[in-house]
């Protein structure tokens, strides 16, 4: 047995970054195959390998943090910096989509009819499903904060209730968004309006699904007493991510649905 004289976690070699990258390649290639050739086989393989990677990577992190005690205060500080930088990178990711939208809408070209929305496009009513979606996500922001406060105060039952409500609202948002896509009077192939609308709201929807998955993992961990009032970075990271998703939706709603 070796003894370390520092507070940092020397991670064992792991296959999950490689399998995660390969599954992402399969998913993006599968998406292109689905769009162009109506074949979902590659996409399904990518999704399956991605789910397997996520399950096993999360399992390893839970073992290292909760059961082996490798997540010392110094390690948690590094993880916090990592999560903050990740969220900043996500902000820049969505900035690109907003840039594309405003670039197209503030000075519409003659090909678009010199107006926005382009000629022939019938935009969705912002006071119907989009407003309900906004209410749902804002309510989920309140419930995740309730869960965090309950955890800090050691109130396990209220934490589980609030977390369950947040997950339910996240799933409800996803179903509403799917129904909106199904009923939309335009498609992703309807010029720059369709492209910017579906890519921006679609990537946001993907982030809601990722955030919901993150919260579901936290819910099951809390059922097994993994979190304490002073050792719960996994939940804290999920809450930060959820608030980020919430704020991005507000910008999407104001920009694309209401103004655009």
Swiss-Prot record:
It catalyses: 4 Fe(II)-[cytochrome c] + O2 + 8 H(+)(in) = 4 Fe(III)-[cytochrome c] + 2 H2O + 4 H(+)(out). It is a multi-pass membrane protein. Its main location: mitochondrion. Disulfide bonds: none annotated. Residues 35-40, 106-128, 184-190, 257-260 are mitochondrial intermembrane. InterPro entries: Cyt_c/ubiquinol_Oxase_su3, Cyt_c_oxase_su3_dom, Cyt_c_oxidase-like_su3, Cyt_c_oxidase_su3-like_sf, Cyt_c_oxidase_su3_a-hlx. It is found in: Mitochondrion inner membrane. One of its GO terms (biological process) is mitochondrial electron transport, cytochrome c to oxygen. Coiled coil: none annotated. The chain crosses the membrane at residues 16-34, 41-66, 73-105, 129-152, 156-183, 191-223, 233-256. Its EC number is 7.1.1.9. One of its GO terms (cellular component) is respiratory chain complex IV. One of its GO terms (molecular function) is cytochrome-c oxidase activity. Component of the cytochrome c oxidase, the last enzyme in the mitochondrial electron transport chain which drives oxidative phosphorylation. The respiratory chain contains 3 multisubunit complexes succinate dehydrogenase (complex II, CII), ubiquinol-cytochrome c oxidoreductase (cytochrome b-c1 complex, complex III, CIII) and cytochrome c oxidase (complex IV, CIV), that cooperate to transfer electrons derived from NADH and succinate to molecular oxygen, creating an electrochemical gradient over the inner membrane that drives transmembrane transport and the ATP synthase. Belongs to the cytochrome c oxidase subunit 3 family. Component of the cytochrome c oxidase (complex IV, CIV), a multisubunit enzyme composed of 14 subunits. The complex is composed of a catalytic core of 3 subunits MT-CO1, MT-CO2 and MT-CO3, encoded in the mitochondrial DNA, and 11 supernumerary subunits COX4I, COX5A, COX5B, COX6A, COX6B, COX6C, COX7A, COX7B, COX7C, COX8 and NDUFA4, which are encoded in the nuclear genome. This is Cytochrome c oxidase subunit 3. The lineage of its organism: Eukaryota, Metazoa, Chordata, Craniata, Vertebrata.
